[in-house]
């Protein structure tokens, strides 16, 4: 897999947990965003942004922390221009220090918790949008942004306000207050005190425009979609792996599945149907297409016209001779 690594382009690191019941060395309790105490294994992936596909993976013991695995993997693949993306649970000053003192040119973009102290409370309480550095649009959504320099290590905090997200958060808060869904007692008008709704922030050692940071991290959301695909759609589940060799085989099959899934994402994004269907939609649409045999004749069952049009648009020919 190392031969697939681009030498002068950016790649991204990300990891996910798979819970397993196997009694073997790779299965161990460790950190995961769900804070589950079940034994797990960690799957660390390297993704290429220009080619937009998974390039490299490692199966790790569940107790191995990502910061150590990131550094070891950097050395293993010989990466010279890499960006680490992680979830909200990863950021801490010790983790940042480990990456920055590794002696490697590691760049990172980490999301911050909504209650982070790196953004002053007064910033949220100020309701005047002139406090922002600027604004851009993404998918017909208005995104305001502010960039802060923090500390003396060349790190920056990028803070955003998504007005559409803010409206959704406010609606959700009021609905919970009206129906007493929360353990704490709130009145609907307490929504006026929730100054952080619609805000989200990242910390990064990249000194670039806030829009670039936003777009780079959005690629992780595409990766999350693929991890969801692995966990929910691919039947090779590590839950019932009996030993490390069996688990390694499952990881390889998952990798092959992920390559096809990313190929589907790329083909769909380049077609006229990229706003109409998701990769999961296409998989559901085509799962009943079968090859049937009558006597000595083999044929593909009838395909609905709309599905055939979509398949043709993304370059899939299910009627080809193999």
Predicted feature descriptions by range:
Residues 1-322:
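Anion-binding and metal-coordination hotspots
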């Amino acid at each position: 897999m190392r031969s697939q690594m681009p030498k002068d382009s950016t790649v991204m690191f990300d990891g996910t947990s798979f819970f397993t019941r196997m009694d073997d060395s790779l299965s161990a309790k460790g950190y995961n965003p769900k804070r589950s105490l079940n034994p797990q294994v960690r799957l660390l992936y390297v993704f290429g942004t220009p080619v937009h596909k998974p390039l490299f993976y490692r199966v790790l013991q569940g107790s191995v922390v990502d910061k150590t695995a990131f550094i070891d993997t950097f050395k293993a693949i010989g990466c010279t221009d890499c960006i680490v993306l992680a979830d909200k649970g990863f950021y801490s000053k010790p983790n940042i220090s480990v990456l920055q003192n590794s002696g490697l040119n590691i760049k990172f973009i980490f999301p911050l918790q909504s209650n982070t102290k790196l953004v002053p409370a007064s910033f949220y309480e100020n309701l005047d949008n002139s406090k922002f550095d600027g604004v851009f649009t993404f998918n017909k959504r208005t995104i305001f942004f502010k960039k802060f320099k923090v500390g003396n290590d060349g790190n920056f905090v990028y803070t955003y306000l998504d007005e559409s997200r803010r409206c959704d958060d406010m609606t959700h808060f009021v609905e919970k207050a009206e129906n007493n869904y929360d353990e704490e007692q709130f009145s609907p008008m307490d929504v006026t005190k929730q100054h952080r709704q619609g805000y989200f922030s990242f910390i990064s050692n990249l000194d670039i425009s806030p829009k670039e940071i936003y777009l780079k991290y959005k690629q992780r959301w595409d990766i999350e979609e693929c991890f969801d695909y692995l966990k929910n759609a691919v039947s090779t589940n590590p839950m019932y792996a009996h030993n490390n060799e069996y688990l390694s085989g499952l990881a390889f099959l998952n990798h092959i599945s992920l390559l096809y899934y990313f190929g589907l994402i790329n083909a769909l994004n380049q077609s006229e149907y990229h706003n109409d269907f998701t990769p999961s939609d296409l998989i559901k649409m085509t799962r009943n297409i079968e090859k049937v045999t009558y006597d000595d004749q083999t044929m593909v069952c009838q395909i609905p016209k709309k599905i055939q049009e979509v398949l043709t648009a993304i370059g899939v020919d299910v009627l080809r001779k193999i």
